[in-house]
Amino acid sequence: MPRSSGAGSLANLDLADRNTLASLQRGEDRTALGLAGVAAGQQSWDVFDQAKAEGGTEWRCLAEALYFEARGESLAGQVAVAEVILNRVDAAVFPDTVCGVVHQGAASGKLHGCQFSYNCDGRPEHISETGAFDQVGRVARVMLDGWARTLTDGATYYHTTAVRPRWARKFHETAAIGPHVFYRRPDTIARN
């Protein structure tokens, strides 16, 4: 649960919390994360001023995916990756759970058979940066609790700028945030 946003709460923040709040205070992150929703009273920045986030299996799957896919990115980049995962959960052509989406194709055993590359890179998934995991855990909690998905315009795909996959030419580019480019199918209209 979010802590009080009173004057004393800032003194209790750990370094990861301070970094999160600092990134929210930068204009581009506020705009990217739905300033209109905050202004309308629909969302509050206080949700990112919370103690260590926790949750069930779906939270754990989302937090792990964010850790392995976006832990070094800005808050906006982490939220954008979370949006893609949650947009897939809502889309009929993907599994209807976060864990199903995140692990889709992992059973194939193929190097590039996974929807999220960390599941098929041949390396064990080990969370060694606890501060980074705490950060993405907070993002996962906020997103699962219903933070408006306004960054990627309904994207259900993304890739790093280090690659140029052929499939991307068939889709509509919706955003470029940090090292990722986001897409949706051309016949898909954002519903979130």
Q: Where are these predicted regions, by residue range?
A:
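Long, low-complexity intrinsically disordered regions
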Residues: M1-S5
